[in-house]
């Protein structure tokens, strides 16, 4: 017989210790009452924001409700089978247990996300740093890693801006669309260090390369970021490309400079200048939001200038291919020897360990 049992109430307390079901239910009831009011749509922006919050709260709470019901049912079935010594139910019990356990892990990961913007899509910007051609190849490897992670979760990935270079990618901005994409990926911001035998070195020597990643939320309309038109300089230019029939023969690429902060964003991968401008503005809003958050937290790193030294001493994670294989996060201390799985998008252990690390160092706030 199967000796495993579904996630226990003790396990639920372990992973959901800061998850107050009653607080969620109370907030949902308050929002539902507000939505039923006759004058609810008198302020459209506020109404849409409340509905978005209601949708997020329901999506967060429902998996826990379902898990509680299904876990209780499975536990009852397990006890009956054990008392009757009925081994024929073992395959079904094992399958149900695996399914519930997987969804429990996903729900316990999501409950670590409490910031307003955690539910949003994400911009992921990657810049190659110290290491020359090797660093450009490393940036391309990280681009693939995040793309594979998104594909594993059935998220959509769109290239907003791409600057190719010899050996790989000089810089790239991805837009990753999916539930809580920003919340899951926000811990990827920082410098990533690669150690390997370089395929570009004929002497087969070991090289160290650095690449920086910056993750920003794709803000929706209810997150206020005010940008004055006089504070922006908009430049258009011809999109780059590999040549052939897809080369853009018009000045459709857009570069926007925010004059007060010096933040520069570009977009060249949409089909028209209008679309490129809209995407660039969305990216600028995200960058300014992150910039203001950094100022409020009184941190020294500035997302605007992106001048943090992409080299020794600043890395958040190391990826070692030689003389041994290991990926180690220097903040949460999470590590694994299966580096190839990580490079193929298996980031969940690092995402979870960082969010748990973040939750122990900050106060997680439940709905009010």
From Swiss-Prot:
A GO cellular component annotated for this chain's UniProt record is:
cytoplasm
Q: Consult the record and explain the modifications the protein receives after translation.
A: Methylated by PrmC. Methylation increases the termination efficiency of RF2.
Alphabetically sorted, this entry's keywords are: Cytoplasm, Methylation, Protein biosynthesis
Which compartments is it annotated to reside in? Answer: Cytoplasm
Molecular function in Gene Ontology: translation release factor activity, codon specific
User: Would the keyword Cytoplasm turn up in this protein's UniProt record?
Assistant: yes
- Reported function: Peptide chain release factor 2 directs the termination of translation in response to the peptide chain termination codons UGA and UAA.
| Name of the protein | Peptide chain release factor 2
Which species does this protein come from?
Treponema pallidum (strain Nichols)
């Amino acid at each position: 017989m199967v000796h495993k049992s579904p996630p226990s109430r003790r396990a639920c307390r372990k992973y959901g210790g800061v998850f107050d079901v009653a607080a969620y239910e109370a907030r949902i009831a308050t929002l539902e009452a507000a939505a039923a009011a006759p004058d609810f749509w008198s302020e459209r922006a506020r109404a849409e924001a409340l509905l978005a919050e209601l949708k997020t709260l329901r999506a967060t709470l429902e998996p826990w409700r379902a898990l509680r019901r299904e876990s209780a049912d499975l536990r009852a079935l397990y006890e009956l089978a054990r008392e009757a010594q009925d081994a024929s139910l073992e395959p079904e019990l094992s399958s149900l247990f695996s399914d519930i356990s997987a969804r429990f892990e996903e729900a316990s990961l999501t409950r670590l996300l409490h910031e307003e913007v955690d539910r949003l899509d994400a911009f992921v910007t990657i810049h190659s740093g110290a290491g020359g051609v090797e660093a450009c190849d490393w940036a391309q490897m990280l681009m693939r890693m995040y793309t594979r992670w998104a594909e594993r979760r059935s998220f959509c990935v769109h290239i907003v801006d791409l600057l190719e270079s010899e050996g790989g990618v000089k810089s790239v901005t991805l837009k990753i669309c999916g539930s809580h994409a920003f919340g899951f990926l926000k811990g990827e911001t920082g410098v990533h260090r690669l150690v390997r035998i370089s395929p570009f070195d004929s002497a087969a020597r070991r090289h160290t390369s650095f690449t920086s990643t910056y993750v920003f939320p794709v803000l929706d309309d209810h997150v206020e970021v005010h940008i004055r038109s006089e504070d922006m300089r908009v430049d258009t230019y011809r999109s780059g490309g590999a040549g052939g029939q897809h080369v853009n023969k018009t000045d459709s690429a857009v570069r926007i400079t925010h004059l007060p902060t010096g933040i520069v964003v570009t977009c060249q991968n949409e089909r028209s200048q209008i679309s490129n401008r809209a995407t660039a503005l969305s990216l600028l809003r995200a960058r300014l939001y992150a910039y203001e958050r950094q100022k409020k937290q009184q941190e020294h790193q500035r997302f605007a200038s992106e001048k943090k030294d992409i080299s020794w001493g600043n890395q958040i994670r190391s990826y070692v291919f030689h003389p041994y294989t290991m990926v180690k996060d220097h903040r949460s201390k999470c590590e694994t020897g299966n580096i190839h799985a990580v490079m193929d998008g298996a980031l969940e252990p690092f995402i979870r360990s960082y969010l748990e690390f973040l939750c122990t160092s900050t106060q997680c706030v439940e709905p009010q």
